[in-house]
Amino acid sequence: MLEPVFVDTGYVLALVNEHEQHHAQAVLLAQRYDRHPVVATDAVLLEIGNALSRLARPAAAQIMADFRESVGSTVVHLTPELFDAAFARYQGHADKTWGLVDCVSFVVMRRMGFRTLLAFDQHFVQAGFVLARP
């Protein structure tokens, strides 16, 4: 079985939007990691839904349904304990511009042992993770 890969919002947005600056790289990453199981949080799915609600609502709905229904994907749900851990990280790094959803991802990735992810956000690098390369 292939190693699971964590998915960030920015990767999905770049994959869907051909005008996004990272689109070509996202397509290459999608090809490379096509058969890998994927992991995201429901907070990431909320960001995807919000970001695509006006321009690509059907695509957003399909992406979220695929994440929720596919046997090859795992959605980690936001619990009160997970929120508290992410919020503590958010508060504890006032010198960073990390978003709260990114902090949720950081906590989940550390707990699940992820080092590499599908993303273009340098905040993950600041937090000690590695962005996947095509």
Task: Give residue ranges: language-model regions.
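Acidic, PIN/NYN-like endoribonuclease modules and their adjacent C-terminal/linker elements
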Residues: L2-P4, F106, R111-P134
